[in-house]
Amino acid sequence: MSQTLSFVLKTHNVRKDFVRSVKLTLARRRDLQYFYNKLSRSMRAEACPSCASYDVCPNCTSSDIPDDGSSTELIPSWEEVTKTSTYSLLLSEDTSDELCPDDLANVAAHIRKAISTQSHPANSDMCKEQLTSLLVMAEAMLPQRSRASIPLHQQHQAARLEWREKFFSKPLDFLLERIGVSKDILQITAIWKIILEKACYCKSYGEQWFTTAKQKLREMRSYESNTLKPLIGAFIDGLRFMTVDNPYPMGFLPKLIGLIKPLNLAMIIDNHENTLSGWVITLTAIMELYNITECTIDLMTSLITAFYDKIGKATKFYSHVKALFTGFRTEDVSNSFWYMAAAILCYLVTGLIPNNGRFLKIKCLLVRATTLVSGIIATQKLAAMFATWNSESIVNELSARTVAISELNNPTTTSDTESVERLLELAKILHEEIKVHTLNPIMQSYNLILRNLMSTLDGVITCCNKRKAIARKRQVPVCYILTGPPGCGKTTAAQALAKKLSDQEPSVINLDVDHHDTYTGNEVCIIDEFDSSDKVDYANFVIGMVNSAPMVLNCDMLENKGKLFTSKYIIMTSNSETPVKPSSKRAGAFYRRVTYHDVATLVESHKRARPGTAVPRSCYKKNFSHLSLAKRGAECWCKEYVLDPKGLQHQSTKAPPPTFLNIDSLAQTMKQDFALKNMAFEAEVGCSEHRYGFVCQQSEVETVRRLLNAIRMRLNATFTVCVGLEASNSVGCTAHVLTPDEPFNGKRFVVSRCNEASLSALEGNCVQTALGVCMSNKDLTHLCHFIKGKIVNDSVRLDELPANQHVVTVNSVFDLAWALRRHSTLTGQFQAIRAAYDVLHVPDKVPAMLRHWMDETSFSDEHVVTQFITPGGVVILESCGGARIWALGNNVIRAGGVTAIPTGGCVRLMGLSAQTMPWSEILSELFSLLGKIWSSVKVSTLILTALSMYASRFRPKTEAKGKTKSKIGPYRGRGVALTDDEYDEWKEHNAARKLDLSVEDFLMLRHRAALGADDTDAVKFRSWWNSRSRLADDFEDVTVIGKGGVKHEKIRTNTLRAVDRGYDVSFAEESGPGAKFHKNAIGSVTDVCGEHKGYCVHMGHGVYASVAHVVKGDSFFLGERIFDLKTNGEFCCFRSTKILPSAAPFFSGRPTRDPWGSPVATDWKPKPYSTTSGKIVGCFATTSTETHPGDCGLPYIDDNGRVTGLHTGSGGPKTPSAKLVVPYVHIDMKTKSVTAQKYDVTKPDISYKGLVCKQLDEIRIIPKGTRLHVSPAHLEDFEECSHQPASLGSGDPRCPKSLTAIVVDSLKPYCVVVNGPPHDILHRVQKMLIDHLSGFVPMNISSDTSMLSAFHKLNHDTSCGPYLGGRKKDHMVNGEPDKALLDLLSSKWKLATQGIALPHEYTIGLKDELRPIEKVQEGKRRMIWGCDVGVATVCAAAFKGVSDAITANHQYGPIQVGINMDSPSVEALFQRIKSARKVFAVDYSKWDSTQSPRVSAASIDILRYFSDRTPIVDSATNTLKSPPIAVFNGVAVKVSSGLPSGMPLTSVINSLNHCLYVGCAILQSLEARNVPVTWNLFSTFDMMTYGDDGVYMFPTMYASISDQIFANLSAYGLKPTRVDKSVGSIEPIDPNSVVFLKRTITRTPQGIRGLLDRSSILRQFYYIKGENTDNWKEPPKTIDPMSRGQQLWNACLYASQHGIDFYNKVYKLAEKAVEYEGLHLEPPSYSTALEHYNSQFNGVEARTDQIDTSGMAALHCDVFEV
């Protein structure tokens, strides 16, 4: 609508009243918007639900609040509002009153006024951020159903929805960044909602969303400075102790000087240099000065280790670090050491990176501190600033997160069970985080707000639990029914039974009531008289209760909606023996779920004996012994009968006798039934790393058990010793003593020595020697001291305490923090400071504080035991994976000293015992030994390194000359001198190829290229050097006149610029003007004065296409008036005698690109639009290119480069992306046909055997018969051969299928549309392949300008095509074409020189060849596409040079067309294959018919890229891109896809297609796994292609996704298979035996050879080529002895490479052929054949034509091919 409006507003011919009405409407809307904004600034006082629906609400008519906050008639004053309980709750005062809607409305009204008016008294109490956050806090504290009463709730919700729509598609990094910088609480809440929503649906959006959400919920933006208070407090205490409280004040100054060592420190700082070596020297000197070198090295080691553990998960790490450092302001300081110290101090105090903004705020406060009073005031303001950054931001952040989570608790948002589970987990994490803040003393003033937030999250957690329970299977309860006469005591017995089943009070359900809000969900449920009402469907109710499916109860109260039935035991009573009739449809389901107990009592006998008298109390017993409980059998519908399984005769099966029980046994039976009903098979636990098995003989079990117990006592270990597989609960690992036959799912160790004397070895602390096991120190430490989880012990037993390794007396917080670092990992050390602070200052809460700290801390795998002696008591901490802690208020003296870590001795890796140890453990021991060696020399190594750096300061440095003297030197290395020319070469090479080579690398590469090295880099360098040499004349002599006088210089006319490959930019992201498509076919249309009006496009033969409003009036083209103008709507055509050098093809279809290559989005539906030139029927489209007046007439093209529409209008500056395109329509401009064409578009379509085609005037039949005959030597045994001549048609008994049917079946796949890869993926890969080939193929290869020269480059043994019968050599006289052929060539060449596309037509035939017998029986033959000789000549002239350049570099590039497989080239292939990590050999089924036209067009564009872009090239390009037309049997079929086998340059185009397909599949697979591809794929892997044959050499990354790569190839329409055509997935193959081009590339005793398939060699002896015949089983009448002898000779040479055994078999066949065929040939011996082949392979003797042919099995080509 907006684009249409823009066209309407530009139209001059529309009615004035319509324009006036539009203007008035827009003005009215602006006035209403201004009035609405004014009203929104004067906020209303009421919480009116209708306000959102009106611009001016009719209900809100109260006056505004005065500026001073005084009261009005309806609204109390600000002073009165602050006294209400609602305001107190918002300010977190101690009140439990609920939020009153009226009070909230009043508070909101004053807050609105305070925001807009500075004089309002609320501004003196709170800042504006606090005012705006109050309502958000209130929203977070209320349940979601109660938020409608909060003022501005609907506006807040709408704002959050708008922010959600804006940010929902943004990446995670962007959202996290916005949270960190945004100050808008509504925006932050919306972003949190997006993150949490995608985290709940991480299955669709990625697991990183859920992981990041869990991590970020535990983090806060603000820095809590109270963690530094213990540090500052300890510093103050230490300073007080050294000064005021020092008993020897005179000794303080010398001690302080001796501690600081100021002279040495000053000398170190004065010698500091701001370089890498300078920092190393300075820091090393300071560490050595204060004797902290060793501990600093250990700390740096742990930091680097943790950094490299986390860097793999970091995203955009480089950009973040770069942004951090580039954001700092450069300061003019003489020594950067003090600047660094100030920055670190600011970070430690404020917790904020000292960027420019924070420094400015602090600086503004400190600048005013000129006196003592102003200094105190400034300090107070700084403290207030820091407090505001901490507390307020924490509460606001928690409120935003709570609102986001509560709004996600909605079935429409989180719909499936997985999302509910993740939402539940996120809510629990946030609940725990808020709970932690409630324990913080600094946050006590906000405690009530935090508890209300926790209450809101409790509601979310409860709701999520309900929703999970509804969707999950539950335990099936047990239902017992007590039946008997009234008054027998059933209800009392049910109550007594309920008490024995559970300590809880039973839940009671009354089925006579519709709603069950009173149901409590306890374990036992009693339903008394469940069948008393006939109106209740009690049978289905019972079936629903006793079921594994969740049962939702019908409740009336809102908070009980979704309540589930959860009881385990159901006890029901009934007076009816059979409540459900056996004939009921639900009887089977009912009686299967319940168990009946018939209740009888002594009261009945008393009533019968004494009717009319009251029953005495003596008839009732407290233990219910007066009751008789008879348990019926299963499915007994009465006492006598059981339900019939068939449901027919229910009184046919007698019931078993009942079982009599009492109340106690009945309760026990119910518990057993419940356990039996809910019994399930559990999967066996996999191999556990906390279970250790010691395997010994049965007689040694007891001894090993005693040894292990002795080890446990000796080392005070935490593991538990068990005999057998059963394990008991343990705080650590479990050691199992096993026999060899017992299975075990843990780590196994074989005990090789076991006796009582080994106990003495324990005194030497060598556990492995005592047991005789090969066990690493890591495993031993893990076994003995691993702790599961985190345990806090409030009570202490001295015999359970571990021996201390460290005893720390805590005098300051530094002592505690430094000791805790031994226990924690790097991330856990930051929590140690807060725990130390809590232990020191709040000793009464030691267990709670340490429990929380331990839950949040990750402990190292090393065993560490530390005893802390603190003022509040003693704390003992033991950690190893987990942790145990003992905390006491009193001091405890712990004896036992310091223990040593158990070791395995120095001989445990010697002997055969090490064979059972994995390599990882052996290497771990090696690294441990190297670590010990390093620990002994690390300090001295660092000091010596720093000393050598210090000494190198005074060493003279070599400096290069010329341009490398100063700042423009090489990137790496020193002392390399370059001349000016060499420097220019180095810079140009790096810029042209986008490399970062150092000077040394560049000189080495240039040297290797000059010496003729054949590696890829050297070849590409030579190609670049040649291109640069051609540009040597790009200089111009100029005269420069300046202050220095007159100088003569040479300046470069071409600017050096790196080529932007754009591998990481998709086609859809490209924009901006560039080179126009079909620029050689586009001309300018001018008026009589020569001014430009628009463009036209040459269609050929002097016919041009344009748009009507451009050629309207007097129009000229190239200075000549246009004529013969014809229009069809806005599209028009005209003629001109001025003919452009090229022509563009036109087609009716949807465009994909605009004239400059940008993508086009359009529905391509012509509609009338109003423009400045009147009504125009066209199609609306959008592109990213901005057009200008005068661009009308430019072409819009499709994927094949065909023009489908012309530009005719745009939306102007307001909507520049809107375009109006006139689609192409056919206009008959023909005068007389100048060339023959079989396919006539004017003829009607006909259906021919299922094909849509055009009927021709002449009929060319498909040739019949075959020239293949059985050899006279094999008339009897020719059936032993695996191949036979192809099917001959309907008369062939092997397959009666006609030749026409075979051709039709072969053409049908070509008529199916194949889409191929996505367009943007294909475009990117095409650019990569062009860049890769640019290193081998030169640019601007000249096309052939001579028609006869191009014709002689063709193979004259092939067909002339559909316009001339026979082969080319049939029309040759003395080596030159005859008149018929010359006339045809001349007519086509004339059109090609004008850039006009030629008819793309082929004549169809069937290949006469040997085929496998099974394919002969199926009637499968390969088609021959006979290309028009004129088209072939034009294509040879255009692209033969480019094709030869590509094939000449087959040794380096991916295309192997032109390779000789019987030459040393095969050795180069083998070396390429051997260097790959994974090798895949792939073949494709139906390759030709599955080719996408878009891929073929991209390959043809690659050929055109390297050509000289002449009209001949344009004609060939447009011809080959047009759909091929198959001509046969008097019809012409236009195919939709596929690549004709007879297309010119088919091998090269097929190979380029192959490369593009594989590159697209790899690119799409990588980016599907979130790997952005910014590099050239073809530079990272190698491949060899020849048509459909391919060998892919993948690195590990690509091989890991090979399944996805081949799946993508299949999705493109291809059919990849194994080389041997076997069924199964394509897997890596052995690189020592790779099949390529029907050759097996492998190593033989003679070297690397390409072995021809044995069956191909053997069938040479069975068949001979002769005259055409229908009886191929008869020998030919004549045999050419020369050709046949050469064929058999070559077969013997190929057979010699397979070994002597196979050669002997071939030799016998050769002797038999010579005898029966009368050949003058003596078959060579094995040694002779081997010698001849090796000589020809190495180029010693001339190769025969057969061997010299490249490609497939070449030795029979002259004999068997057509």
Curated annotation (Swiss-Prot):
Domain SF3 helicase, chain residue ranges per copy: 458-614
Start and end residues of each RdRp catalytic domain: 1477-1602
SUPFAM superfamilies for the chain: DNA/RNA polymerases (SSF56672), P-loop containing nucleoside triphosphate hydrolases (SSF52540), Trypsin-like serine proteases (SSF50494)
GO terms assigned for molecular function: ATP binding; ATP hydrolysis activity; cysteine-type endopeptidase activity; RNA binding; RNA helicase activity; RNA-directed RNA polymerase activity
EC number(s) stated in the UniProt entry for this protein: 3.6.1.15, 2.7.7.48, 3.4.22.66
O-(5'-phospho-RNA)-tyrosine: residues carrying this PTM: 983
Active-site residues, record numbering mapped to chain: 1109 (for 3clpro activity), 1130 (for 3clpro activity), 1192 (for 3clpro activity)
This protein's name: Genome polyprotein
Species this protein is from: Feline calicivirus (strain CFI/68 FIV) (FCV)
High-level lineage: Viruses, Riboviria, Orthornavirae, Pisuviricota, Pisoniviricetes
